[in-house]
Structures are given as C-alpha cells and as structure tokens.
Amino acid sequence: DGNIVIDSRNDKVWPMTWYGTVIKNDGKTGFVNRKGEYVIRPGDYDVGDLDEINGLLVLKDGKTGKSGIFSVETGQQVIPFRYDGITFAGSDRLVVEKNGVRSLYNMRTGYSVFSVSTDMTIDPFLHDRLTWVHQGSSNYEVINDQGQILFADKEGLIEEARPFSHGYSAVKAKGKWGIMDA
C-alpha cells in the first residue's frame, strides 16, 4: 500500500520477517511487529539467531554478556539471560554454551540430549534429523536429533562435510568429494 511502517530515523533495521523486525536506535535494540508496534521493548541487547518457525529471538544482555530467548509474538522472555551463547539448530533443537560446555537441547522437553566441550561445533539440523559434530576440520561425528552418535571418523579422513539431506551428506576426504549416508 506504500504506507510507512517503520520510519527511517533508526540506526539500523533488520529485514522484515513474518513476525516483524529488529530495530536498533540510539544504542538500544528492540523488536517491532509488522504494524510498527514494539513487541520487545528497546534495551541494551545484541542480536543473535532468529527462529522464524517458532517466533523466537536470541538476545545477548549488553551488561552481563549472557544470552536468553524472547518470543517475538508476545515479547515474553522464555529463557533467561544465563547462557554464554545460544543458537538455533533446527525447528525443535537449540545449542547452548555455558561454562565451557556446548549442549544440544530438545526445545519441546527442555532437556539436553548431547554435550561436548566448546572447542567442538554442533552443526544445525537443516533438512534432516542428522547433523555433524566436529572440531574445526577434524574429529567428525554424525549424531541424530536424540544425541546418539551414529558414526565417528576414527581414522581422521574427513576434511569437510556438508549438511545432511534425506540421510546423505557430501563429504571431502583426501582432497576429493563424495556422498556418504549415516
């Protein structure tokens, strides 16, 4: 319709989502709905991941450096600022970091299903119920969404791996690419 929903006086405006968008102005960050109304009041936050499926936003408290999660529908804080880091790892999984431990959580139950040290990476579950866990470009393992290790590269042959799709992943070993299943 050509109506201005959010005026152009802000320091930064993120791309619009189904729920609305993040706005930063005068050093304060908030979330507004598609009508331009604040859902999450401006505060001293850094912006993290946005889960557009579940309407959740990771914000890091600028004073404590701890991360929490807010609902972008209601503005309610659903996970307090207590974690060193939070990333969404799929439609019902998230990865949290606290005290040198990186844990994969089931968002429905609230329970950790897998944990490693923070020098390891837990890749997101994109279009599958499988993902890679690795330490840089080594120590590759495949886990399912329940945290069970299905494969471990004990010989250290894998140099790089792509996300799983339909149970298969592109994998680089000895400088060449191939496809493997879990």
Feature roles, as predicted:
Residues 1-182:
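Residue-level detector of conserved, function-critical positions
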